Amino acid sequence: MKNPIYLDYAATTPVEFKVAKKMMNYLTIDGIFGNPASRSHKFGWEAEEVIDIARNEISELIGSDSREIVFTSGATEANNLAIKGIAFFHRKKGNHIITSKTEHKSVLDACRYLESVGFSVTYLTPKNNGIIDLNDLKKNINKNTILVSIMHVNNETGIIQDITNISKICRSHDIFFHVDATQSVGKIAINLKNLFVDLMSFSAHKIYGPKGIGGLYVRRKPRVRLSALSHGGGHERGMRAGTLPVHQIVGMGESFKLARKKINDDFIHLTNLRNDLWNGIKNIEEVYLNSDLKQGAPHILNVSFNYIEGESLIMALKDLAISSGSACTSSSLEPSYVLRALGIKDELAHSSIRFSIGRFTTKEEIQHTVKSVHKSIHRLRALSPLWEMFKSGVDLNSIEWDHT
């Protein structure tokens, strides 16, 4: 058993050995290293061919046409391209966008940027269970609404949104629907042929592929048109300029191929380990589940341990690689904006820990994690004056604290 135990798979995943080995064949003079845009010789033709193969593997996993895949540097760029691209191209049609308060920062910051240049954005507040209220969505649609952007699986809580019915609502109002599927692709079955989704973002490094490569699904029928964010060369059907990184795309294609083969076994494996973890810690006093075992993805478990700062617990659990939220915001001392949007009070949001498990997590590692959490919680609470006051029956909410 490795030490520390890696339980931050929602932040990134290790590259599968088979993926890494295959990527090595597309880097050196002995392999296929050509520029796929060089169509006058064999090196370019070979590079273009393997990219087409990768596109096919990606489309097979998500149920799309391979021609609907646009390569990007990752999900952050894909989210920006989808949101800004639709907004700028269709500005004459309308300037209103709908998203939610619990989206990834790459979506929220893109929307805030659009607000600064004249767009109007509605940020929906999910229900306390994290699910978007479909009636609330309908009420906020107006004649100027051009785009709805909702993530499939939340990166902090693992909550799964009902993108099937959201897509139907958007289609009935002739509104573009963008889905950030970074945490769901390869973990939950997706078939875009059965959904009215117009754009979908995803990344390779979340499903055992390389970092620095991702994609945006852009529907062809009915055709979705958007403005490019980068220009020069007309790559990716004019939507994303730049020489394609062949080795990364090959790695992405291979990781998606493996995900398609392993998705059912992975789902069972992750669900069992997540349930083992929760069953092992749920009887700790003042522990709160911020995820939903029925409406949540199998790889994420978000838990609050009252009267203990999440950062303190992370430091105490040196043998575990865990986080206090999204990898993009975990360095912030502010409580999770996602948990606050769900109505969770600051004290519990501050005490939250995200455990995220993966393909290589073992039952032995989960058993060790349960023991470590119990031990650290007991030790930290023994040092906590707040815990002592709580156990003495003091109503901490009635105390007026001096913040001077």
Swiss-Prot record:
Alphabetized PROSITE patterns for the sequence: AA_TRANSFER_CLASS_5
Cofactor: pyridoxal 5'-phosphate
InterPro entries: Aminotrans_V_dom, Aminotrans_V_PyrdxlP_BS, Cys_deSase_IscS, Cysteine_dSase, PyrdxlP-dep_Trfase, PyrdxlP-dep_Trfase_major, PyrdxlP-dep_Trfase_small
EC number: 2.8.1.7
An individual GO BP term: [2Fe-2S] cluster assembly
Catalytic activity reported: (sulfur carrier)-H + L-cysteine = (sulfur carrier)-SH + L-alanine
Coiled-coil annotated spans: none
Positions of disulphide bridges: none
Active-site positions on this chain: C328 (cysteine persulfide intermediate)
Modified residues (N6-(pyridoxal phosphate)lysine): K206
GO molecular function, one term: 2 iron, 2 sulfur cluster binding
Binding site for [2Fe-2S] cluster: C328
Enzyme type, top EC level: transferase
Predominant location: cytoplasm
GO cellular component: L-cysteine desulfurase complex
Role played: Master enzyme that delivers sulfur to a number of partners involved in Fe-S cluster assembly, tRNA modification or cofactor biosynthesis. Catalyzes the removal of elemental sulfur atoms from cysteine to produce alanine. Functions as a sulfur delivery protein for Fe-S cluster synthesis onto IscU, an Fe-S scaffold assembly protein, as well as other S acceptor proteins.
Similarity field: Belongs to the class-V pyridoxal-phosphate-dependent aminotransferase family. NifS/IscS subfamily.
Subunit text: Homodimer. Forms a heterotetramer with IscU, interacts with other sulfur acceptors.
Protein name: Cysteine desulfurase IscS
Species assigned in the record: Buchnera aphidicola subsp. Schizaphis graminum (strain Sg)
